[in-house]
Amino acid sequence: MKNPPVCCVITRLPEAESLKKSEGAAFYELRLDLLGESWREAAAMLDKPFMATCRRSAEGGSFSGSEEERIGLLEKAAAAGAFMLDIEYSTPHLGEVLKRLRTQSKCLVSHHNFADTPSAGDLKTLVKDMLNYPADIYKVITTATSINDNIKLLNLIKEIPDKKIVAFAMGNLGILSRILCPLAGSPFTYASLNDSNQSASGQMTLAQMIEIYRSVNYENHT
């Protein structure tokens, strides 16, 4: 049965047995900031494409080096085979950074709000501002404080159909948007490899996500 593309997040060196259970993933995300020096070893274990992400502490990650070091690490990941690089919208000199990195890999520009979910109008304005920076995919992640926040993010995807936008909310109240965003038009959604690889609040495991899609017969709704 066809499932929506799911990006499987890896935050620590995986066990071979865990990877065997991840056949439902479309590709992986390697969190370079959390994997540390073991990211190369993790990349060598993968049998599917991977995206590379290196989050600063201000963006919910653990990288504490300079911006040049961080961008350099992403370049190393691209050289090691990363097909896409996640670049935060808050990155200093974003235009120059994207121009530099897009010669080496596809790029995803991301924005994370760890406090709440802005109004629908503010979300649309945010995305329009992000679109000023050429990228392959745009990602807007907020924090749900109400079940209605899921609706805002799902509508955001549908309102800009000519661009590839991933949008959902973190937190237990945002789980619904994590599951449904592909139905609204997101190119993919995220899940953790297992419970020990969770990288954000409300993130489900790959096995849980796949089971839900199978239970609701996802293929017949696309």
Curated annotation (Swiss-Prot):
Catalytic reactions on record: 3-dehydroquinate = 3-dehydroshikimate + H2O
Recorded metabolic or biological pathway in which this protein acts: Metabolic intermediate biosynthesis; chorismate biosynthesis; chorismate from D-erythrose 4-phosphate and phosphoenolpyruvate: step 3/7
Residues that coordinate or bind 3-dehydroquinate: 29-31, 55, 178, 199, 203
Swiss-Prot/TrEMBL keywords: Amino-acid biosynthesis, Aromatic amino acid biosynthesis, Lyase, Schiff base
UniProt-listed Enzyme Commission number(s): 4.2.1.10
UniProt entry tagged with the keyword Acyltransferase: no
A Gene Ontology BP annotation from the UniProt entry: aromatic amino acid family biosynthetic process
Subunit record text: Homodimer.
Functional note: Involved in the third step of the chorismate pathway, which leads to the biosynthesis of aromatic amino acids. Catalyzes the cis-dehydration of 3-dehydroquinate (DHQ) and introduces the first double bond of the aromatic ring to yield 3-dehydroshikimate.
Family (UniProt): Belongs to the type-I 3-dehydroquinase family.
Protein name: 3-dehydroquinate dehydratase
Lineage start: Bacteria, Bacillati, Chloroflexota, Dehalococcoidia, Dehalococcoidales
